[in-house]
């Protein structure tokens, strides 16, 4: 299973990630829901491509980690708008400081049968 994690981590590290975000909703995020809201986000004008994974929390709820490639001027409110959610749903938003570190962090639980995907704007144009 470690091979899956290191494989994805190395693969993601090849992309130029500019921002990272965490999305927390007031309900458990299903695989279908995660797919729908991340598709909405990648279709949103400023986003070029993204990677997401849904991670479980302690209290039978979960959250989405996002890796984004977007202009440096993008803000938390823009991410929420692209997701079609309220701004507080984006509980964390920041520029990427280390591509290698964030690629590992966002792939660390991929062996736990969680939803994840890499999406490019060109897929949805």
PLM feature segments, named:
Residues 1-62, 70-125:
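Right-hand nucleic-acid polymerase module
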């Amino acid at each position: 299973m470690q091979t899956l994690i290191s494989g994805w981590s190395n693969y993601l590290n090849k992309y130029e990630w500019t921002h990272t975000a965490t999305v927390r909703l007031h309900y458990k995020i299903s695989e279908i829901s995660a797919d729908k809201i991340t598709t909405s986000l990648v279709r949103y004008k400023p986003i070029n491509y993204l990677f997401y994974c849904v991670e479980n929390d302690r209290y039978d709820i979960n959250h989405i980690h996002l890796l984004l490639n977007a202009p440096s001027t993008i803000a938390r409110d823009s991410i929420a708008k692209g997701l079609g959610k309220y701004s507080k749903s984006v509980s964390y938003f920041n520029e990427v400081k280390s591509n290698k570190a964030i690629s590992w962090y966002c792939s660390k639980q991929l062996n736990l049968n969680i939803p994840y995907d890499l999406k490019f704007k060109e897929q949805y144009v």
